[in-house]
């Protein structure tokens, strides 16, 4: 198909500086060919970079934050799994780790933080409080989990979850990133 477009056809009279009639079709087909040739290897490289350099933002309201701190320490060293502890802007983070109870008053703020993160963005709900409301599930002001406010990619159960469980959740998130197609 590309050869047909590139082959010289009957000479049409055109004024100098004008493009041939099939120029736009040629550019469109050429871009399709390039996208097909580059899409898979480039997508693999970009997903590889994403899965080994997740920048988390923490929403800490309960004891799960202590376990995340333990996972970041030298014994478990969560950085070897690509969770980079960097302190920057929300617009640089691509992973939100929600740890603890989320109240109705906090829900708009959680959504605002999520909306400020760049695409692709991922969410880990860590602990029973973030997943189901925890001990305060029947309180009038506590949300029964954050999945009603923002989409959750990985649930890490426990009260509080052990660092090993958090690492397993990070590995599950990496598997999900591997399976997604680069956009």
What are these regions (language model features)?
Residues 65-67, 101-105, 130-132, 161-164:
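Gly/Ser/Thr-rich loops at beta-strand to alpha-helix junctions
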Residues 1-89, 117-121, 137, 142-143, ...:
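Iron-sulfur (Fe-S) cluster-binding modules
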Residues 2, 80, 98, 102-107, ...:
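Metallocofactor- and cofactor-centric catalytic cores in central/energy metabolism, strongly enriched
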Residues 71, 92-100:
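Short, basic, glycine/proline-bearing loop/turn elements
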């Amino acid at each position: 198909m590309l050869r047909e477009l590139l082959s010289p056809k009957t000479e049409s009279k055109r004024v100098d500086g004008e493009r041939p009639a099939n120029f736009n079709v040629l550019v469109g087909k050429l871009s399709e060919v390039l996208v097909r040739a580059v899409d898979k290897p480039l997508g693999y490289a970009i997903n590889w970079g994403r899965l080994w350099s997740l920048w988390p933002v923490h929403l800490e309201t309960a004891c799960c934050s202590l376990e995340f701190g333990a996972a970041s320490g030298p014994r478990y060293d969560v950085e070897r799994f690509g969770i980079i502890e960097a302190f920057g802007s929300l617009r640089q983070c691509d992973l939100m780790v929600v740890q603890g109870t989320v109240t109705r008053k906090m829900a708009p703020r959680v959504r605002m933080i999520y909306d400020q993160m760049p695409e692709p963005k991922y969410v880990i709900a860590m602990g029973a409080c973030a997943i189901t409301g925890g001990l305060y599930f029947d309180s009038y002001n506590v949300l029964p989990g954050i999945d009603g406010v923002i989409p959750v990619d990985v649930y890490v159960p426990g009260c509080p979850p052990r660092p090993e469980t958090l690492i397993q959740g990070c590995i599950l998130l990496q598997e999900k990133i591997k399976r997604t197609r680069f956009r």
